[in-house]
């Protein structure tokens, strides 16, 4: 597959990234650009997906709050989190099935985490990748997806070394009582370079 992988250094403002992503998606739809997987980090921000409830925003002045076009509810992005924007043309794969695509994303992230001896699972009910921790589950990767003419955009956010206290201003993904975790919180000190390498390796096992 002729897919471009882009890794941005430093922190990329959320709205700047979304505008660039939408522009790229338009070109993929038109057939003038290759598909892309974009790996980046954002400065601290809360994003409100298309089904966000205002009651899930607990502290409205902690970080900027931005409405976004992805599916889902409130989420947090910030330093130490690997954001993965996936721009794939599902028509080219004869896979015009959004549920199957989301499941494939789940398999990809679960397999990537397994590279670092993390046992996780994808939930189709509470969309995302979770880790069972003692008596409850904690989310380690959040999903938010949108399609334009069967080209995917937005994607996945995986907590590597994220400051988990930054989630205190929201009900993450609208799921009361659920926790969040990170590779660091699970005792895994992993660099972005190491994680990105595993992501790329496992990607081609799922998205042939």
From Swiss-Prot:
It comes from Anaplasma phagocytophilum (strain HZ). It is an enzyme of class 2 (transferase). Keywords: Acyltransferase, Cytoplasm, Transferase. Its main location: cytoplasm. CDD domains: LipB. In the reaction, the free carboxyl group of octanoic acid is attached via an amide linkage to the epsilon-amino group of a specific lysine residue of lipoyl domains of lipoate-dependent enzymes. Pathway: Protein modification; protein lipoylation via endogenous pathway; protein N(6)-(lipoyl)lysine from octanoyl-[acyl-carrier-protein]: step 1/2. Residues 31-208 form the BPL/LPL catalytic domain. The gene is lipB. GO terms for biological process: protein modification process. It is found in: Cytoplasm. One of its GO terms (cellular component) is cytoplasm. Catalyzes the transfer of endogenously produced octanoic acid from octanoyl-acyl-carrier-protein onto the lipoyl domains of lipoate-dependent enzymes. Lipoyl-ACP can also act as a substrate although octanoyl-ACP is likely to be the physiological substrate. It catalyses: octanoyl-[ACP] + L-lysyl-[protein] = N(6)-octanoyl-L-lysyl-[protein] + holo-[ACP] + H(+). It holds the Pfam family LplA-B_cat. This is Octanoyltransferase. It comes from the Bacteria. The lineage of its organism: Bacteria, Pseudomonadati, Pseudomonadota, Alphaproteobacteria, Rickettsiales. InterPro entries: aa-tRNA-synth_II/BPL/LPL, BPL_LPL_catalytic, Octanoyltransferase.
């Amino acid at each position: 597959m002729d897919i471009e992988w882009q890794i941005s250094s430093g922190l990329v403002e959320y709205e700047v990234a979304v505008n660039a992503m939408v522009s790229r998606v338009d070109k993929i739809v038109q057939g003038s650009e290759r598909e892309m997987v974009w790996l980046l980090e954002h400065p601290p921000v809360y994003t409100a997906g298309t089904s966000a409830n205002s009651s899930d925003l607990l502290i409205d002045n902690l970080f900027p709050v931005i409405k976004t076009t992805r599916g889902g509810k409130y989420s947090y992005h910030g330093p130490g989190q690997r954001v993965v924007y996936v721009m794939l043309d599902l028509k080219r794969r004869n896979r015009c099935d959004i549920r199957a695509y989301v499941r494939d994303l789940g398999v990809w992230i679960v397999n990537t985490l397994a590279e670092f001896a993390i046992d996780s699972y994808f939930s189709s009910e509470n969309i995302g990748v979770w880790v069972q921790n003692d008596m409850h589950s904690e989310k380690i990767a959040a999903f938010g997806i949108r399609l334009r003419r069967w080209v995917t955009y937005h994607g996945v956010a995986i907590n590597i070394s994220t400051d988990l206290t930054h989630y205190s201003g929201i009900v993450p993904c609208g799921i009361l009582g659920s926790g969040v975790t990170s590779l660091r919180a699970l005792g895994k000190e992993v660099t972005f370079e190491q994680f990105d390498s595993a992501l790329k390796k496992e990607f081609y096992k799922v998205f042939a």
